[in-house]
């Protein structure tokens, strides 16, 4: 049976395609915005049946052009949290997603989709419930609105609907994301170019580099998606994070120490890295004040209750692995 991945040439989509390939799944229709031609590089080592532009996909899918489709992994979206064009964001992230959802419901196709922890905004609790949801930007709002649609249609749905609120994802195949790539990616490139990494200084009661996030490896993100793909009877909206909050300083020290290890140099503590000028703190930008999550930590209660019991990589494990992968791409 055919599988469809939207946003297939993007960061998470391409990793899902690769994970499906590793299980022997190759009857995959990859859907993406083909105006960004360079993104095809994420699929060069993947096996797919077809590669469609997003503008033609929904109509053809709704028409039944692809025969029996077992599942759609809907990862396609504008993920730029600094995008201010509300119409563009709503068209891409809300209306387009509704059209894909409607086609899946009509055909009895599993629908697994990307939600976002941006829905929680400045909340101090990250539980999949309406009272904790207060997005700070139009990206988060577009995801929030779609999750409200899901909550309304899920009770009557005859096929699986599984949404994943991704926390701070990092890992291979994100280089095309530019400024929205992970801090691990930017730290890697900064250190190679300048011999140091830069982090935000103190802000909102947090010390330099001490803003904390739930950093989750894209390897784990793909594994969770495939777990629910294998269990089509399980529906819901689930946090997808490690359940641990770690400071940006942990990312920086891991990047620096992994690169040092690759050059045969010993590991250093954060204090030693700062003292030697390998980690530098810059003033918090005015443009982000009031729109920035200083703390995120996924509540995994629902995810674990749904049967996902595998451990998640820590920053030290996942970022080390990622830096070695990036180094191998040079």
Curated annotation (Swiss-Prot):
Cofactor note: Binds 1 NADP(+) per subunit.
Keywords: Carbohydrate metabolism, Isomerase, NADP
Keyword Isomerase: yes
Principal EC category: isomerase
Catalysed transformations (reactions): ADP-D-glycero-beta-D-manno-heptose = ADP-L-glycero-beta-D-manno-heptose
MF (Gene Ontology): ADP-glyceromanno-heptose 6-epimerase activity; NADP binding
Entries under Gene3D superfamilies matching the protein: NAD(P)-binding Rossmann-like Domain (3.40.50.720), UDP-galactose 4-epimerase, domain 1 (3.90.25.10)
Record-linked Pfam families: Epimerase (PF01370)
Claim: Glycosyltransferase is one of the keywords in the record: no
Annotated active site: 139, 177
Notes concerning its domains: Contains a large N-terminal NADP-binding domain, and a smaller C-terminal substrate-binding domain.
PANTHER family referenced in this protein's UniProt entry, alphabetically: ADP-L-GLYCERO-D-MANNO-HEPTOSE-6-EPIMERASE (PTHR43103:SF3), NUCLEOSIDE-DIPHOSPHATE-SUGAR EPIMERASE (PTHR43103)
Role played: Catalyzes the interconversion between ADP-D-glycero-beta-D-manno-heptose and ADP-L-glycero-beta-D-manno-heptose via an epimerization at carbon 6 of the heptose.
Name of this protein: ADP-L-glycero-D-manno-heptose-6-epimerase
Organism expressing this protein natively: Burkholderia mallei (strain ATCC 23344)
């Amino acid at each position: 049976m055919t599988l469809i991945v939207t946003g297939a040439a993007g960061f998470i989509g391409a990793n899902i395609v690769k994970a499906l390939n590793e299980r022997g799944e190759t009857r995959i229709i990859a859907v993406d915005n083909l105006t960004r031609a360079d993104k095809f590089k994420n699929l060069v080592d993947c096996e797919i049946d077809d590669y469609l532009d997003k503008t033609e996909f929904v109509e053809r899918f709704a028409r039944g052009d692809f025969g029996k489709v077992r599942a759609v992994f809907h990862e396609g979206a504008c993920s730029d949290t600094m995008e201010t064009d509300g119409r563009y964001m709503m068209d891409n992230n809300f209306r387009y997603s509704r059209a894909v959802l409607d086609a899946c419901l009509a055909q009895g196709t599993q629908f697994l989709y990307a939600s976002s922890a941006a829905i929680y905004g400045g909340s101090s609790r990250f539980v999949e419930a309406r009272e904790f949801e207060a997005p700070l930007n139009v990206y988060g709002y577009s995801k929030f609105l779609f999750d409200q649609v899901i909550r309304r249609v899920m009770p009557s749905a005859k096929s699986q609907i599984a949404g994943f609120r991704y926390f701070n994802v990092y890992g291979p195949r994100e280089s095309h994301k530019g400024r929205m790539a992970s801090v691990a990616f930017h730290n890697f490139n900064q250190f190679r170019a300048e011999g140091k990494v830069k982090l935000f200084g103190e802000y909102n009661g947090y010390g330099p580099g001490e803003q904390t996030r739930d950093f989750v490896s894209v390897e784990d993100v793909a594994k969770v998606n495939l777990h629910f793909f294998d269990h089509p009877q399980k529906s819901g909206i689930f946090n997808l994070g490690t359940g641990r909050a770690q400071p940006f300083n942990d990312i920086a020290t891991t990047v620096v120490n992994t690169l040092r290890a690759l050059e045969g140099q010993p590991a250093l503590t954060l204090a030693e890295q700062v003292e030697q000028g390998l980690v530098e703190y810059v003033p918090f930008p005015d443009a982000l004040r009031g729109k920035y999550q200083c703390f995120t930590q996924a509540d995994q209660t629902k995810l674990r209750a749904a049967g996902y019991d595998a451990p998640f990589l820590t920053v030290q494990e996942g970022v080390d692995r990622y830096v070695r992968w990036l180094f191998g791409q040079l």
